[in-house]
Regions:
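Acidic/glycine-enriched connector segments
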Residues: 1-125
Length: 125
Protein backbone atom coordinates (compact mmCIF):
# COMPACT_ATOMS: atom_id res chain seq x y z
CA UNK A 1 0.00 0.00 0.00
CA UNK A 2 1.26 3.46 -0.89
CA UNK A 3 1.06 5.67 2.18
CA UNK A 4 0.89 9.43 1.65
CA UNK A 5 1.48 11.40 4.87
CA UNK A 6 0.30 14.98 5.34
CA UNK A 7 1.17 17.26 8.26
CA UNK A 8 -0.68 20.45 9.13
CA UNK A 9 0.75 23.49 10.91
CA UNK A 10 -0.97 26.79 11.54
CA UNK A 11 -1.70 29.56 13.99
CA UNK A 12 -3.27 29.19 17.39
CA UNK A 13 -5.89 31.74 16.36
CA UNK A 14 -7.56 31.73 12.94
CA UNK A 15 -8.93 35.03 11.61
CA UNK A 16 -11.15 33.65 8.85
CA UNK A 17 -12.08 30.06 9.74
CA UNK A 18 -14.64 29.65 6.96
CA UNK A 19 -12.12 30.55 4.26
CA UNK A 20 -9.47 28.26 5.77
CA UNK A 21 -12.02 25.46 6.10
CA UNK A 22 -13.00 25.71 2.42
CA UNK A 23 -9.35 25.65 1.35
CA UNK A 24 -8.61 22.67 3.59
CA UNK A 25 -11.67 20.83 2.35
CA UNK A 26 -10.56 21.22 -1.26
CA UNK A 27 -7.09 19.84 -0.52
CA UNK A 28 -8.36 16.99 1.65
CA UNK A 29 -10.98 16.01 -0.94
CA UNK A 30 -8.31 15.83 -3.64
CA UNK A 31 -6.06 13.68 -1.44
CA UNK A 32 -8.86 11.29 -0.49
CA UNK A 33 -9.84 10.83 -4.13
CA UNK A 34 -6.36 10.47 -5.63
CA UNK A 35 -4.15 8.75 -3.04
CA UNK A 36 -4.23 5.08 -2.13
CA UNK A 37 -3.95 5.79 1.61
CA UNK A 38 -3.59 9.14 3.38
CA UNK A 39 -2.32 9.62 6.91
CA UNK A 40 -3.35 13.05 8.23
CA UNK A 41 -0.92 14.06 11.01
CA UNK A 42 -2.26 16.75 13.32
CA UNK A 43 -1.51 18.41 16.62
CA UNK A 44 -3.94 19.86 19.11
CA UNK A 45 -2.42 23.20 20.01
CA UNK A 46 -4.81 25.83 18.72
CA UNK A 47 -7.72 26.77 16.49
CA UNK A 48 -6.01 25.73 13.27
CA UNK A 49 -5.31 22.21 14.55
CA UNK A 50 -8.91 21.78 15.68
CA UNK A 51 -10.20 23.18 12.39
CA UNK A 52 -8.04 20.72 10.43
CA UNK A 53 -9.19 17.76 12.52
CA UNK A 54 -12.87 18.59 12.18
CA UNK A 55 -12.49 19.17 8.42
CA UNK A 56 -10.69 15.85 7.93
CA UNK A 57 -13.40 14.04 9.90
CA UNK A 58 -16.17 15.68 7.87
CA UNK A 59 -14.44 14.91 4.56
CA UNK A 60 -13.90 11.31 5.58
CA UNK A 61 -17.60 11.04 6.43
CA UNK A 62 -18.87 12.70 3.23
CA UNK A 63 -16.27 11.78 0.61
CA UNK A 64 -14.44 8.59 1.53
CA UNK A 65 -13.48 6.97 4.80
CA UNK A 66 -11.77 3.71 3.79
CA UNK A 67 -8.37 5.06 2.75
CA UNK A 68 -7.20 7.42 5.47
CA UNK A 69 -6.54 7.94 9.13
CA UNK A 70 -6.57 11.02 11.32
CA UNK A 71 -3.54 10.76 13.61
CA UNK A 72 -3.04 13.01 16.61
CA UNK A 73 0.68 13.40 17.28
CA UNK A 74 1.36 14.57 20.82
CA UNK A 75 4.77 15.93 21.82
CA UNK A 76 4.51 14.14 25.20
CA UNK A 77 1.89 12.58 27.45
CA UNK A 78 -0.44 15.38 28.51
CA UNK A 79 -2.81 15.50 31.45
CA UNK A 80 -5.64 16.33 29.03
CA UNK A 81 -5.00 13.10 27.11
CA UNK A 82 -4.47 11.00 30.22
CA UNK A 83 -7.72 12.26 31.78
CA UNK A 84 -9.77 11.93 28.57
CA UNK A 85 -8.16 9.01 26.78
CA UNK A 86 -11.44 7.38 25.76
CA UNK A 87 -12.77 10.61 24.20
CA UNK A 88 -9.53 11.13 22.30
CA UNK A 89 -9.70 7.61 20.86
CA UNK A 90 -13.31 8.17 19.79
CA UNK A 91 -12.33 11.34 17.91
CA UNK A 92 -8.98 10.39 16.35
CA UNK A 93 -8.24 7.19 14.43
CA UNK A 94 -4.81 6.91 16.03
CA UNK A 95 -2.86 8.71 18.71
CA UNK A 96 0.92 8.80 18.77
CA UNK A 97 3.22 10.22 21.38
CA UNK A 98 6.35 11.34 19.56
CA UNK A 99 9.20 9.46 21.21
CA UNK A 100 11.82 12.00 20.15
CA UNK A 101 10.01 14.93 21.74
CA UNK A 102 8.75 13.06 24.80
CA UNK A 103 12.35 12.78 25.99
CA UNK A 104 13.07 16.51 25.57
CA UNK A 105 12.40 19.45 27.86
CA UNK A 106 8.75 20.48 27.51
CA UNK A 107 9.71 23.92 26.16
CA UNK A 108 11.41 22.37 23.13
CA UNK A 109 9.12 19.34 22.77
CA UNK A 110 6.71 20.96 20.30
CA UNK A 111 9.54 22.00 17.99
CA UNK A 112 11.02 18.49 18.08
CA UNK A 113 7.58 16.93 17.47
CA UNK A 114 6.93 19.29 14.56
CA UNK A 115 10.27 18.45 12.97
CA UNK A 116 9.50 14.74 13.31
CA UNK A 117 6.10 15.23 11.66
CA UNK A 118 7.68 17.12 8.76
CA UNK A 119 10.31 14.42 8.32
CA UNK A 120 7.68 11.72 7.88
CA UNK A 121 5.43 13.78 5.59
CA UNK A 122 5.06 13.83 1.83
CA UNK A 123 3.14 17.11 2.07
CA UNK A 124 3.12 19.86 4.69
CA UNK A 125 0.23 22.32 4.85
Amino acid sequence: MNLFAVSFFGHRQVDNPFLIERQLESIIRELLLTKEYVEFLVGRDGEFDLLVSSTVRRCKRTIRDDNSSLVLVLPYMTAEYRNNEESFHEYYDEIEICLESAEKHFKSAHQVRNRSMVDQSDLVI
